[in-house]
């Protein structure tokens, strides 16, 4: 703080640049991370990148029944939803602490 209670703008700028760099690094790490979702007790598994891209699907042959395709479809949707939930948790874990760091800049409303 400068005299008169005003924040030191150069220090604020340096801190903002540091937080921005950390945020970019965390976003890159998140995009490159992989999470796994599953349904049916692991009979259907999905691998998803942190960006949301599905990069793999594994289906146990036990759930492949030509007369009951609907169940398999439901399991695939469930596994994708589980993987998406894992991405959300990962994003919160990686990016959440950085959002908290913005409050320390000494700016009103942050």
From Swiss-Prot:
InterPro entries: YbaB-like_sf (IPR036894), YbaB/EbfC (IPR004401). One of its GO terms (cellular component) is bacterial nucleoid. It comes from the Bacteria. The keyword Metal-binding does not apply. SUPFAM superfamilies: YbaB-like. Keywords: Cytoplasm, DNA-binding. PANTHER family: NUCLEOID-ASSOCIATED PROTEIN YBAB. Belongs to the YbaB/EbfC family. Binds to DNA and alters its conformation. May be involved in regulation of gene expression, nucleoid organization and DNA protection. This is Nucleoid-associated protein Mflv_1287. It comes from Mycolicibacterium gilvum (strain PYR-GCK).
